[in-house]
Structure formats: C-alpha cells, structure tokens
UniProtKB/Swiss-Prot annotation:
The gene is clpX. GO terms for biological process: cell division; proteolysis involved in protein catabolic process. Keywords: ATP-binding, Chaperone, Metal-binding, Nucleotide-binding, Zinc. Gene3D superfamilies: 1.10.8.60, ClpX chaperone, C4-type zinc finger domain, P-loop containing nucleotide triphosphate hydrolases. ATP-dependent specificity component of the Clp protease. It directs the protease to specific substrates. Can perform chaperone functions in the absence of ClpP. InterPro entries: AAA+_ATPase, ATP-dep_Clp_protease_ClpX, ATPase_AAA_core, Clp_ATPase_C, Clp_protease_ATP-bd_su_ClpX, ClpX_bact, P-loop_NTPase, Znf_CppX_C4. This is ATP-dependent Clp protease ATP-binding subunit ClpX. NCBIfam families: clpX (TIGR00382), PRK05342.1 (NF003745). Zn(2+) binds at C15, C18, C37, C40. Signal peptide: none annotated. Component of the ClpX-ClpP complex. Forms a hexameric ring that, in the presence of ATP, binds to fourteen ClpP subunits assembled into a disk-like structure with a central cavity, resembling the structure of eukaryotic proteasomes. The keyword Zinc applies.
C-alpha cells in the first residue's frame, strides 16, 4: 500500500504506478491496497485507444474481392449485373494498386470510370455503395455547376474540398477517396470544331477536370475558408483518388448508329432510326467506342482518362417493383419503419406496387421518381396519423395510387370486432 507520514501525523497517499503523491496530481483513485492517479488513468486510456485504432486499421486494410464487392452491391442496387461486374473489378484493381506498390518498377495506371445510363438507372447509388463497402470518403459533384477558374460558378477544386469535408479534413484519407461527378455529358463540347469563343461550361471545364482526374496537387483552403493570398492551403494529391463520372448521354445511340450503319441509306435507314426500344438502345450502346464519345463532344484527352466505360440499362416495370421491395433500404421498408414508429403497420398490396412502377415509367424518371410518388401518396396519412389514436394498419391499394380513393385505415377496435365476430 502506497502510504507514508508527512511529519504532522497525516498519511500521504502515493500512486502505486508512477509514485507521485496525492499533492502532485489532481485525483488519486483508491483500489484494494493500491492507488492510481488521474495521469496514469489517462495514459492507460491513450495506450488502449492507440491499440484499438491499430487493430481497426488492420481490419479495414483487407480489400474485398470483386465477387464480394458485387454481392454487396446486390444488396442495395437492383439489376445492372454487367455494370456491377465491371465496377467491382475496376475498383478492386484500383485499391489493390494502392495497397501493393509495384516492386518490379511497372507503373500501374489509374482506372477512372465512366457510367452511361438514363436518369434513375442507379449510377449515383452504385458509386455511393462502392464507397460504403470500401469505407472510404465519398463526394458528389454536379458537372453542370462547374466552370473554369476565374468565371462565376463552382471551381473544380471545390470537389476536393467536399471530399475533405467528408473525412474531417484528413488529407491522407481524402487522397484515397471516391469522387462521383454527375451530368458529365452536359459539359460536352457544343460542336465538333474547337470554338474561338470561350466555352466556359463545356470544353474549358473538361480541361480543368482533366488535370484533377489524371492526378495533380490541388490547393484547398482549410475548413472551408475562402481563398486569399495569405492563407495556408492544404495540398491534396489527386493521383490516387478514384473518379467515377456519370451521365445519361441522350442521343449517344444515334452517334453510334451513324458510325455503324453508314452502309444503310434511304428508306431502310429511316426505319432503323425510328426503332428505338429500350432493348435496342442497350444493344447499340454495347457497341460504344471512344470515337463515339469524342464525336458526342468529350475531348480526346478526357475520354483517355476514363478507360473503364460501362452502360446501364433503363429499368423496366419488374425492376422498379423489385427496387420498391427487395433492397436492404427499399423505399417501402423505409416508410413501413416510419409508420411503425407511430405504432401502425403499413401494407402495400401487389396491385399498388405495379401501379407505382407504371407511374414512374410514365414520368421517365426511373428509380429516382419512386420516392416522390410514395411521398405524394402517403402525405395526407403521414400528416393525420400522429393525431389519430388506435390506427393499427394503413393499407395502400391500386385505387389509392391512382388518386381514386384514400388509404384504408384499420383501427384497433375494428380488428377487435372482427376477431370477436369470428369467435361467434
């Protein structure tokens, strides 16, 4: 026991670990025959915290295989199997390249990705889900808001600032993150010939993005401050950031047809151009070549920095119904969870799900339109439900989706009556 006298008859207590007296520390904690000071407790906490952090980093270091990545994507994204396979391999190779620096002197190039597919086909969700499984920072940018430096609009380096914000300005983490740039087709060059006038939101932005995507050291103001000459900038190397660009590329199928069907002229060519079902468009996009993207309006250097290109198919009715019900975070499950918090069960009948999918197809918004349709259907019920008592179940059928009737509310007393009636 760490005790001793101080000459006045009072016993002075000492820490059993560092030997400091009770007068030298803020707090001395007593245990069975031992004492420990606040400084030693803090030191022990630091040691445990450091060891836990190292163990956590070792666990995180394991890179999932392409199959594991694809299986994880299956839990959140419906369909698009070919795109999932392409993405899984590209992402696996990218992070394997970072983990194992080449020992034989072979420099491995970065495989940035271009996703081509209609609105609501799952481009953004695929990129977000990839970042989740790999546990890396993820930032999104809209290409339509970007302009060249010096013009009114968003500077391309703001993309890196968004990435830094997602990881609390940890530069090392940000340098291994994923950036998704949406609406990339909207910055295509306005014509085949380079214009003598400035194309502030077209070719100029492609040139600015080109440096960022291929790898440069971007100067970013710390903690979201504005740039000014006296400020210290954070230096972020973008060489190892994975860039995924996405866009609908409306009319790209026509560019491909023009190239592949040059032999078809006259009446037969007109017939072919009118025939544009979803399946046929998907087949045509499957024949995509780099020259088609250049013809569409992307500059050759930009196309060259996006070596992995994959297309996503437009979602049909069956896929939209699956999206409503199957994924871990399916929309119907989300709303059912909200209603459960109010003590009510939410039921969607099969014909209601079909009607919702048909509405989304009519709006040509793909999966993106599903939430707004559901919000609209359930708005009045979500407004009234917290004020109502004894609502056990809310039922949505086809007539509710089509606006012909209101959701069916089943009260607790109604269920009791039906239960007692069945007993009689």
């Amino acid at each position: 026991m760490s005790k001793s006298g101080n000459g006045n008859g009072d016993k002075v207590l000492y820490c059993s670990f560092c030997g400091k007296s009770q007068h030298e520390v803020k707090k001395l904690i007593a245990g069975p025959s031992v004492f420990v000071c606040d400084e030693c407790v803090e030191l022990c906490n630091d040691i445990i915290r450091e060891e836990t952090h190292e163990t956590h980093e070792e666990t995180e270091a394991r890179l999932p295989t392409p199959k594991e990545i694809s299986n994880f994507l299956d839990e959140y994204v419906i369909g698009q199997q070919h795109a999932k396979k392409v993405l899984s391999v590209a992402v696996y190779n990218h992070y394997k390249r970072l983990q194992h620096k080449s020992e034989d002197g072979v420099e491995l190039g970065k495989s940035n990705i271009l996703l081509i597919g209609p609105t609501g086909s799952g481009k953004t969700l695929l990129a977000q889900t990839l970042a989740r499984i790999l546990n890396v920072p993820f930032a999104m940018a809209d290409a339509t808001t970007l302009t060249e430096a010096g013009y009114v609009g968003e500077d391309v380096e703001n993309i890196i600032q968004k990435l830094l914000q997602k990881c609390d300005y940890d530069v090392d983490k940000a340098q291994q993150g994923i950036v998704y740039i949406d609406e990339i087709d909207k910055i295509s060059r306005k014509s085949d010939n380079p214009s003598i006038t400035r194309d502030v939101s077209g070719e100029g932005v492609q040139q600015a993005l080109l440096k960022l995507i291929e790898g440069t050291v971007a100067s970013v103001p710390p903690q979201g401050g504005r740039k000014h000459p006296q400020q210290e900038f954070l230096q972020v190397d973008t060489s190892n950031i994975l860039f995924i660009c996405g866009g609908a590329f409306a009319g790209l199928d026509k560019v491909i047809r023009e190239r592949s069907d040059k032999s078809s002229i006259g009446f037969s060519a007109q017939l072919k151009s009118k025939k544009s079902s979803n399946d046929e468009v998907s087949k045509v996009l499957g024949q995509l070549e780099s020259d088609d993207l250049i013809k569409y309006g992307l500059i050759p250097e930009f196309v060259g920095r996006l070596p992995v290109v994959t297309t996503l198919q437009e979602l049909d009715e069956a896929a939209l119904i699956d999206i409503l019900t199957r994924p871990k975070n399916a929309l119907t499950k989300q709303f059912q969870s909200l209603f459960k918090m109010e003590g009510s069960e939410l039921e969607f009948r099969d014909e209601a799900l079909i009607a919702i999918a048909k509405k989304a197809l009519e709006r040509k918004m793909g999966a993106r339109g599903l939430r707004s349709i559901l919000e609209n259907i359930l708005l009045d019920t979500m407004y009234d439900l917290p004020s109502l008592e004894g609502v056990n179940k809310v039922v949505i059928d086809e007539s509710v989706v089509n606006g012909l009737s209101k959701p069916i509310l089943i009260y607790e007393q109604d269920e009791k009556k039906s239960a007692s009636g069945s007993k009689d």
